C-alpha cells in the first residue's frame, strides 16, 4: 500500500495525494512527496492532510510550500479539531497559486463559509491545549486498540490517522462486518480489489473501543450466517 513516486510521472493532470492515506492509514514520507513535486513542475500537486495531526512531528508537507510553486496543502477541521459538522477547512500554497484559486472561486461561487463555522474554526485554532490533549488521547487509544487486534492475530498497519486498517486472521472481512453490525457496532469495509480483505476501524473513547472488542470477540466466535 506504500506510495511509489514513479507511479506519478507523466500523468498529464493535477495530482492529488491523501497523506496520511485513507483508508490504509499509512503515511508517505515527505521525501516521496518532494520527489513527485520535482517530477511534475508544471502540474499542481495537492496534498490532503486531513489526518496529519495524528501522524506525529515532521509528517506535514507544509514546510515544502516555500520551495514549490506547484504545491497546495489542504487541511480540515473535521478530524483533529473536532468540527466535523462545520464543513470547514483551509489550504496553504504560494501566492500565485492561491490567487489562481480565488479567480476560479469568484468565477462561479463568491460565497464564503458561514459565520458560525468561521467563529468555531477561529476558536478551535485558539484552544491549542484542547487540540493537543484530544490528539494525544486518540493516539494513546489507537495504540491500545492496535495491540488488542494484534493479540487476536489480526494484521494491523502502522496507523498515522484516527483509525486502524486491519485484516482479520480467519474469517472474511465482510463476514466480520456483518456480525458486528448485528451487534450494533459499525466499522467500514470496502469491496474493492486489494483491500476487500481489510477493515477500517475508527478510534473512539476507551469505553467505545472496549465495546468494539467485546462485540468482536463474539463476532469472531459466531457461526457464519446462512446464505
PLM feature spans:
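Short acidic/glycine-enriched loop/turn segments that link adjacent beta-strands
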Residues: 85, 160, 194-197
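PLP-dependent enzyme catalytic core of the Aspartate aminotransferase-like
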Residues: 31, 178-183, 187-188, 192-227
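Conserved PLP-binding catalytic core of the aspartate aminotransferase-like
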Residues: 138-139, 151-183, 199
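Short beta-strand-to-loop capping motifs
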Residues: 93, 166-170, 203-205
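Structural motif
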Residues: 14-18, 46, 90-92
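Active-site pre-lysine segment of PLP-dependent enzymes
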Residues: 2-11, 23-45, 49-83, 95
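PLP-dependent aminotransferase class I/II
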Residues: 70-150, 154-157
Amino acid at each position: 500500500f506504500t506510495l511509489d513516486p514513479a507511479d506519478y510521472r507523466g500523468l498529464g493532470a493535477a495530482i492529488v495525494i491523501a497523506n496520511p492515506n485513507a483508508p490504509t492509514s499509512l503515511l508517505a514520507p515527505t521525501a516521496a512527496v518532494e520527489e513527485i513535486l520535482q517530477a511534475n513542475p508544471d502540474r499542481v500537486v495537492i496534498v490532503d492532510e486531513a489526518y496529519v495531526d495524528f501522524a506525529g512531528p515532521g509528517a506535514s508537507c507544509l514546510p515544502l510550500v516555500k520551495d514549490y510553486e506547484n504545491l497546495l496543502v489542504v487541511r480540515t477541521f473535521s478530524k483533529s479539531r473536532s468540527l466535523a459538522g462545520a464543513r470547514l477547512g483551509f489550504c496553504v500554497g504560494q501566492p500565485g497559486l492561491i490567487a489562481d484559486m480565488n479567480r476560479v472561486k469568484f468565477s462561479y461561487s463568491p460565497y464564503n463559509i458561514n459565520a458560525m463555522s468561521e467563529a468555531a474554526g477561529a476558536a478551535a485554532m485558539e484552544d491549542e491545549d484542547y487540540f493537543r490533549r484530544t490528539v494525544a488521547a486518540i493516539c494513546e487509544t489507537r495504540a491500545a486498540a492496535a495491540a488488542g487486534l494484534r493479540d487476536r492475530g489480526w494484521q494491523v498497519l502502522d496507523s498515522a490517522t484516527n483509525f486502524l486498517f486491519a485484516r482479520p486472521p480467519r474469517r472474511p472481512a465482510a463476514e466480520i462486518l456483518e456480525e458486528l453490525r448485528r451487534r450494533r457496532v459499525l466499522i467500514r469495509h470496502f469491496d474493492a480489489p486489494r483491500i476487500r480483505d481489510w477493515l477500517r476501524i475508527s478510534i473512539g473513547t476507551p469505553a467505545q473501543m472496549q465495546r468494539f472488542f467485546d462485540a468482536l470477540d463474539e463476532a469472531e466466535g459466531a457461526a457464519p450466517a446462512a446464505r
